[in-house]
Amino acid sequence: MNGSVLCGLFCFCAFAAAGAADDARLVDTPAKRLSAEEIISKPRPKTVKMRVPDDTRLYIGSGVYENCGRMYAGGFCFTYWSPEKLNYDEVLDLCVKEGVGNTLQFWQSNRTLLELARKAKKLGLYSTCIYSTATNGMAAKISSELGQSWLGHDFGERFSFSLYTDWKDRGVTLRALAEEYMNRVHKHVNDLHAAGWGNVMATSANFSLDYEVAAGTEIPCTEDFPFGDLTLASALSRGLYRQYNLPMWGAHLAHEWYSWIPHKNPYKMKTLETAFYLKYMTGAKLIINESGNWQLQSSLCEDSPMSLMPKPFRKMSDKISSPENRPLLEAASAEAKKKFSYIDYRSPVARKYRKVISDFTAFCRKHPAPKGQPEATWAIAKGNLDLGGASYVPGGAVCGAYDLAKKNPNWMNGIPEMSWETVRKAVMPMPPMLAPNKNIHFSASPYGLCDIVSFACDNVTAEHLLKNYKVIMFAGWNTCSPKQYKILCDYVKGGGKLVIGMAHLSTDEERNYTNLSVEKLVNKGDFTELCGFKVVGETSRKYWATGPSTEKNCLGFVARRRFGYMCLPLGKLEFSAPKENFEELAVDDEDAEPFILRCKNGKGEVLFMNWWAYPAAANMDVGCGSEIEDVGMVGYLYRYAAKLARGNVYITGRDFDNPDEDCGWILYSYFPDEGKVYLLNLDYERERKCVLQQFGDKDFITLKPGEFRIVESVKLDADEKLVTYSTVLSPGDKAIF
């Protein structure tokens, strides 16, 4: 079994054989390496927006694996058996009989894949594949014969920085690593297109999905649950969909493997239902349930039925097929046959999975997925060369670069990666909905949905930003360039509001973020065009920040309420713009040097974080007046900026201005093409209330525990939308996005 298939079967990169991974890397490496700019400049296939089923307006699917009645892996924690029932034909028939979606994702190849896809089409089902191979023109035959019943090829988790330990020829800069990565993706996507597979999808839990799309991938499908926050994953895919004018975007729910909560938690299966509704209301048009409904696979929760299967081998590294282990395996296989009913399609857990999917399918036939994409009037910027993860892992290295980290510890996850946590916790809170278990997958949207806009290779325009987003917030890593700086200037002068800090304007490509300098800043610190000042040096270290006045300002800051410890030098500034262009929003508590500055510029403004570090470094909050629920100085800045971006529809508490505690349990979205608002109460045990403010009206909403509600709203014409995006349709196609 090759490394990529094994990786997909277990959804766990550690299972991929290093040798096979290196083989894939060798196959995907082009003879001539291109620069990122050369890859970006290559023409992409003409975008044809994917048509969706008329009855559901959504592809709802599940993975189809071989049931072979044998052990795939051993280990006291990772033993994984494949049961014997069902065969392929029985899976297809049962899918139709029980209404388990309308799409199947096949893991098979060549003639077997063609025959399965043919039968699926006859049964009225759609097909896609993952990790599949085809020879002798078979891919083109599948694609042409299936027509609109064929969705394309998913290369899965084929690409990762951390799978490879050989650093030869990879370089030691972020740019070199990104280009090496993009070259491999670009070649593989081109090979798939040349073979005739049709649209190319990527299913991955990594945060570098934007580089895969920049290199030519057409349909992003984040592997939700291992990715972490499903709402954040939607923001990434949705932002890429708009930015690259993609055919559609989807979600791959690896719930059985990565929901992680035990079956003894009464909400285990409720979280799968929540995931389907979350993706429906955030704009996905393809949702695949990875496993669990036709057979169980996972041992990643302590009371999984898989944990009751025989475990003849202590170590996962034991070679279960070796001759010396054959007697153990044969004895265990005989015992396992007696327990296959615990993990095959007849098992109670598998039936629960199918019930959730069939119920959701029935719901979609009654309430088809909303047309278009939800209103998202602000975005979090994923900076150029931000190659870390979506969350902060203290023991993790960016790009898996542990060898580089031995020489430069800044290659370990640090303040840049923590800054993603800062913005997420401020505006995308994760309520404790699964107590006593932790919630790491579901965030609310008290400040509205946002997109993630990618600055990868600086392949974005000010026109796109102005067309789509009132506010752009930088949080994690960014390597700035003169090109990017010009984009930001044009965005602000055109009316955009930009939240950005000193560290984001550094040109560093080597993770030397603890040693910032004026010389390393873009334009050597001359931010006159963007902010109206130059950075000429640094102040002494400042320890506390506070409000500039005894009266509360727009951030809610007041003098003598301290934020800190800071322990940070501030930027020493030389102002060139008129004094009235600036407003101090936070200052140090000794000399009133500015921590946060509002800088008006043209039709827009910059909210500038004036310290020599990434945002999270200034978000500690244990000073005078701090309270349990506080989100820190930077957190309040992000919240304020999100409020500035409010669209036609938003929610608040009873003060009609700010989201309250109940709003932190509610996910909502508004689809202007559909003219409907969607609300989901993430609290499975209590009612939650909000004031739904839409188009000047105010409705007092009370959501029952776990309730999903659809509210009629205003359907907008194209020229009435606060945000717009382009579509390219084939003649005769109807617009669905």
Question: In which residue ranges do the predicted regions lie?
Answer:
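Aromatic-Pro/Gly-enriched surface loop or interdomain linker
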Residues: 56-64, 322-468, 705, 731
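Catalytic beta-strand/loop cores that center a nucleophilic Ser/Cys/Thr
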Residues: 507, 539-602, 614-619, 642-693
